């Protein structure tokens, strides 16, 4: 039987990706609550890629715990972030990890103190724009190269509407943890 589930949110990657498929704040809160309910009532481990960043200290990409190498050999910081300065056919993995885009990740992580807003693309698109520009990273999308501006523009509204809900939910979550900790100590 199933012992592990991992939920991923829609990521609007690609020139033709539709931003209106991103979950609404209400849908995201429902996922947050559902995953926590599953953990409390089901005998399986359930993880939510976006809503569980607190368990891994934020975004895992950029070589912190994860990276992506596409079919062309381009070393991307994330499977959803198709921007790079390095190709594994031309450098070592260590050299790729020291490339400008990976160093931008290293300098910026975590991208937000609110672990319900961990992603520099989805919840903090203003950061990804700057990171790609400072790094001079190029699109590595093999089908239809997309600019950082185009990618991030699809996330701006989502980030804006999610921020208020995420900040409230994060504050509540941290208050509950603090209250629980004070009663167990």
Residue ranges and their predicted role:
Residues 58-59, 111:
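Short secondary-structure boundary/capping segments
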Residues 60-64:
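Short, small/polar residue-rich loop motifs at catalytic or cofactor-binding pockets
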Residues 1-58, 71-72, 76, 80-88:
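Radical SAM enzyme [4Fe-4S]-AdoMet core and its adjacent flexible, acidic
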Residues 80-185:
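Flexible mid-to-C-terminal extensions adjoining Fe-S/redox cofactors in radical SAM and related proteins
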